[in-house]
UniProtKB/Swiss-Prot annotation:
Functions as a regulator of the biosynthesis of TSH in the anterior pituitary gland and as a neurotransmitter/ neuromodulator in the central and peripheral nervous systems. The gene is Trh. One of its GO terms (biological process) is hormone-mediated signaling pathway. The keyword ATP-binding does not apply. Residues 177-188 have a biased composition (Basic and acidic residues). This is Pro-thyrotropin-releasing hormone. It comes from Mus musculus. One of its GO terms (cellular component) is extracellular region. Belongs to the TRH family. Pfam families: TRH (PF05438). Specifically expressed in hypothalamus and testis. Its main location: secreted.
């Protein structure tokens, strides 16, 4: 009977002696956590320098790329308002256009309002014998060498050239078009001498009179009308001879 009681007494002693120690340990741990909550751990100490190094590397790379991007990427501009490089502008102000020395248009213009360029703008200062470009048409080259003045761009139907003797000043109807009055007169004279018939005036398809007594091939007068009445009477007589029954049937109501 003494054994169980002895074991229970020992257990109670151990429990009573261990409680103060555990409480003391818990209090010490809480005090340490309250005293050093902001102190960084080992991992945080290692991460901060890495971030600083990465930030410096990114700044250096961005600085290198910024200089390159300024020269590579330019703003998209209108074709007629494209700005020239600063080097070309400075060279043009100095009068040095480079080895080629060609004239470059500053602004794109409307085809019908393009200003005529002077001789000096198309050629070098030292060139005295200047010729227009070879891609121009022949009639333009002929007019250039004949010192004909350049005219303003006109409507296709009202285009007149100073180097032409007979100008087409107004667009005409296809059936009434007379390009050269002298050629028209000569053609009419030759037709009159040969005795041929002149072509009649162009008419509307629904109003065109062909074979009329008063037409171009007929004679409008008393003789023509009498001839027309005679033809009508002859036609009625022939119809009566061919159908006597019809004639009798037509006369019956008249006799009654």
């Amino acid at each position: 009977m003494q054994g169980p009681w002895l074991m229970m007494a020992l257990a109670l002693i151990f429990v009573l002696t261990g409680i103060p120690k555990s409480c003391a340990l818990l209090e010490a741990a809480q005090e340490e956590g309250a005293v050093t909550p902001d102190l960084p751990g080992l991992e945080k100490v290692q991460v901060r320098p890495e971030r600083r190094f990465l930030r410096k590397d990114l700044q250096r790379v961005r600085g290198d790329l910024g200089a390159a991007l300024d020269s590579w990427i330019t703003k998209r501009q209108h074709p007629g308002k494209r700005e020239e490089k600063e080097e070309d502008v400075e060279a043009e102000e100095r009068g040095d256009l480079g080895e080629v020395g060609a004239w470059r248009p500053h602004k794109r213009q409307h085809p019908g309002r393009r200003a005529n360029q002077d001789k000096d703008s198309w050629s070098d200062e030292g060139d005295s014998d200047w010729l227009p470009p070879s891609w121009l048409p022949d009639f333009f080259l002929d007019s250039w060498f004949s010192d004909a003045p350049q005219v303003k761009r006109q409507h296709p139907g009202r285009r007149s050239f100073p180097w032409m003797e007979s100008d087409v000043t107004k667009r005409q109807h296809p059936g009434r078009r007379f390009i050269d009055p002298e050629l028209q007169r000569s053609w009419e004279e030759t037709e009159g001498e040969e005795g041929g018939l002149m072509p009649e005036k162009r008419q509307h398809p629904g109003k065109r009179a062909v074979g009329h007594p008063c037409g171009p091939q007929g004679i409008c007068g008393q003789t023509g009308l009498l001839q027309l009445l005679g033809d009508l009477s002859r036609g009625q007589e022939t119809l009566a001879k061919q159908t006597p029954q019809l004639e009798a049937w037509v006369r019956e109501p008249l006799e009654e």
